[in-house]
């Protein structure tokens, strides 16, 4: 028998990025309404932080995990026999994924750029190193741009890099390539 902690760990790379800050804010509000508290886990500063947080789940410190980080191999998640919810990455057939309609997002982005007469586009895309629903957005965007004859330069961002220095490097690298 194990007494529930009433705590859900929310794993994100960093709350310095507005997307993750807003996501955590909304997750916390919804979980609070259901009688849970969150333990916020920023993982970008420590190499093995994600694994340590999953270990907390196994040791009954938290009742479940909502994860938006994906530095671990999918096999690590498959070992966990407690509630896990992922967003924007498939972690296994028994782990639910929350994702947006990425194909529609790609279509909308392409339509807006085309409507505004854009002819040469730099397309920053997520890493293809992992299977993720966000690839659908990029494929749809690229498909539409190609059909419309718009020149599109794809720039693949490194996997799991969220710091400002990396983005400065990426922009410099992009201009060196163009």
Predicted segments, located by residue:
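Bacterial carbohydrate/catabolite-sensing allosteric modules
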Residues: 29-34, 58, 79-86, 91-178
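Short acidic/polar active-site loop segments enriched in Thr and Asp
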Residues: 6, 63, 118-121
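N-terminal helix-turn-helix/winged-helix DNA-binding helices
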Residues: 1-25, 34-36, 44, 56-59
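Generic recognition of short, well-ordered alpha-helical segments
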Residues: 21-23, 52, 135-136, 169
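Residues that form or flank phosphate/diphosphate-binding pockets in enzymes
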Residues: 18, 48, 132
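Central regulatory/effector-binding core of bacterial HTH transcription factors
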Residues: 29-74
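Short, glycine/serine-rich, charged loops/turns that create anion-binding
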Residues: 4, 15-16, 45, 72, ...
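Residues that line or immediately flank small-molecule/substrate-binding pockets and catalytic motifs
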Residues: 12, 69, 125
């Amino acid at each position: 028998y194990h007494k529930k902690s009433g705590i859900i760990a929310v794993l994100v790379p960093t709350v310095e990025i507005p997307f993750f800050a807003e996501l955590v804010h909304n997750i916390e509000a919804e979980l609070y309404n259901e009688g849970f508290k969150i333990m916020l886990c920023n993982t970008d500063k420590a190499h093995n932080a994600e694994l340590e947080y999953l270990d907390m789940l196994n040791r009954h410190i938290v009742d479940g995990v909502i994860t938006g980080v994906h530095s671990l191999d999918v096999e690590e998640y498959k070992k966990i026999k407690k509630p896990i919810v992922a967003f924007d990455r498939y972690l296994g057939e028994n782990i639910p994924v929350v994702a947006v309609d990425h194909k529609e997002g790609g279509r909308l982005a392409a339509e807006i750029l085309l409507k505004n007469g854009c002819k040469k586009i730099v397309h920053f895309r997520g890493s293809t190193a992992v299977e993720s629903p966000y690839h659908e957005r990029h494929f749809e965007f690229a498909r539409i741009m190609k059909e419309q004859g718009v020149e599109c330069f794809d720039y693949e961002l490194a996997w799991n890099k969220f710091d400002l220095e990396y983005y400065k490097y990426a922009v410099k690298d992009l201009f060196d390539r163009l």
